[in-house]
Amino acid sequence: MYPFDPSSPVSADFRDSVSARILSFLDDEKRVIDAIGAELSPVLDAARDYTAGGKRLRPAFCYWGHAAAADQPIEPTGLLQAAASLEFLHVSALVHDDLMDHSDTRRGLPSVHRHFEAAHGIAHGDGPAEQFGCDIAILLGDLLLMWSSQMFTSAPVKADRLAAATPLLDAMRTEVTCGQVLDVTSQSGMAGSDSESALDLVGRVVEYKCASYTVVRPCQIGVALAGALTVYNRRWPTSAPPSDGPSNTATIFLASSATPS
């Protein structure tokens, strides 16, 4: 029995439960951070602030992918922890994305690099405040990425199911990062000037930075945690047919996963 309403897959109750798992993990990490030094407290505070809120789409697709495939639900804490770990991965990408895009805000707050740039100015720190903000944003993004892996691998889930899901998580991390590289390349104008090449590149950006990363891989991870990869491997596409476009990948997968054989 799942404690959340499938007709409202990203309900406030679901989002609050994901947030609780994230905060619990950060509370545990606080002991490690405090032992290293008080200078790191602002970084941990920023991790709390920037992982708060959000739609929690990736955790939701992971959770409900599991629900669609599982004969019996796994222990709720383990499933929620594994699903919530994807939010750390997402926020890591957002922190770095904001830095590359020179964005000033994120989720109603100053972006991480702007936040620490301002903190440097208030403290009258040495050197350029902008550089300090950029440096801390890179490091916080890296830390969030490492925490995502740590939170996932420490989830109280059967070892064989974590092992089955791990290659999918590896692919998710690689694809979103490569999708970001494609995005930067597309904006640079270095990928060729003909419209067909440009359209192909944009399609791959959408595929790997959005559709696969947001929907397909999280769903697949949930299915793997359900121990149902054998059934589902033949059902989802590894990539979208060119004639259908990248966004169709997620649609095909969701349609196929709704009626398992």
Please report, for each region that a protein language model flagged, where it lies by residue.
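Membrane-spanning helices that line or support transport/gating and their immediate boundary helices
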Residues: 95-98, 147, 151
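All-alpha helical catalytic cores of prenyl diphosphate-utilizing isoprenoid enzymes
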Residues: 32-36, 50-59, 135-147, 153-260
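Conserved N-terminal diphosphate/IPP-binding helix and adjacent helical/loop segment
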Residues: 1-86, 91, 95-96, 100-130, ...
